[in-house]
Amino acid sequence: MRVLAAMSGGVDSAVAAARAVAAGHDVVGVHLALSAEPGTLRTGSRGCCSKEDAGDARRAADVLGIPFYVWDFADRFKEDVIDDFVASYAAGETPNPCLRCNEKIKFAALADRAIALGFDAVATGHYAQLENGVLRRAVDADKDQSYVLGVLTAEQLSRAMFPVGDTPKDRIREEAAERGLAVANKPDSHDICFIPSGDTRAFLGARIGVRPGSVVDADSGEVLAEHEGVHGFTIGQRKGLGVQGPAADGQPRYVTSIEPDTGTVRVGSARNLEVDAITADRAVWTSGSTPVGPVECTVQVRAHGGLAEAVAEAVDGGIAISLREPLTGVAKGQAVVLYRTDPAGDIVLGSGTISGTDARPNTQ
């Protein structure tokens, strides 16, 4: 089988490529150039798409004895990931750019080009398990990335490979060292690659500008402060609110809702964050078939968030989710990923983009 190995320059994708070679596949390595402007992506060992990473990926390919290329996806990345990120925050939403990159770049634009060139699959270093179209959590629960892959369709998964998902991260590093890969001890990347400063608010402000609004008490409606734009806030945020003192009940204040049309940011105590129901649009069902009737499942609403038991039902191209227990910090624009518990690793059932939430009166 001809396999295109997406090599980010990190240890996981290097070992993924190595395992594809060891499995007897005809492997070609490729690194994605994602910025047309030098210096706009992070440089150094902590980046996931920096200039240094391209060199690390090339050296890993040399060790493996496979051809290596750098493909320019800067325009697509800007349009589908960066511009989407900015527009979502301007609309009072909280997007996940890594998730969007998987959906639109790695397993769409990149995979489409790979298939057009005669490749059968794209291998990446994601921590997830995939077999016969079934996407599961990784063996290493701390590194599991099934959440950011939960937006992939059955067709996209049919041409994907995740060779490292069945192995703990520590063992992957050991294997990299055994194979003579210099990236064996390279630190993991954690931040957003196109915000090298790590200052998301400044990045967004430079692109959106000042759009004044008010910070309002969620219970009393009192105006507590003014702000320069809803893009500086996300649901559950506690710091940087521009408000002095706790809520009326003596508890810390959090962002509880964002109203982009009026520029209103409401803040309140933690109880104001609790939701019992989630509505999502852009539903994707991993099996390719939309389920009929209610589905018992667990849901995850953040990349490193916990699971909550729920009942989900497909509704008009979206998903209606009723939670067994309240969740906090649920924001529009986030992905909600549905799982079915399984001893071999929880199975991804599907996902949607959160478009609304609701709470029972007694939780307010």
From Swiss-Prot:
GO terms for cellular component: cytoplasm. One of its GO terms (biological process) is tRNA wobble position uridine thiolation. Its EC number is 2.8.1.13. It comes from the Bacteria. The keyword Isomerase does not apply. The keyword Iron does not apply. InterPro entries: MnmA-like, MnmA-like_C, MnmA-like_central, MnmA-like_central_sf, Rossmann-like_a/b/a_fold. The active site is at 101 (nucleophile), 193 (cysteine persulfide intermediate). Residues 143-145 are annotated as: Interaction with tRNA. CDD domains: MnmA_TRMU-like (cd01998). It catalyses: S-sulfanyl-L-cysteinyl-[protein] + uridine(34) in tRNA + AH2 + ATP = 2-thiouridine(34) in tRNA + L-cysteinyl-[protein] + A + AMP + diphosphate + H(+). Belongs to the MnmA/TRMU family. Catalyzes the 2-thiolation of uridine at the wobble position (U34) of tRNA, leading to the formation of s(2)U34. This is tRNA-specific 2-thiouridylase MnmA. The gene is mnmA.
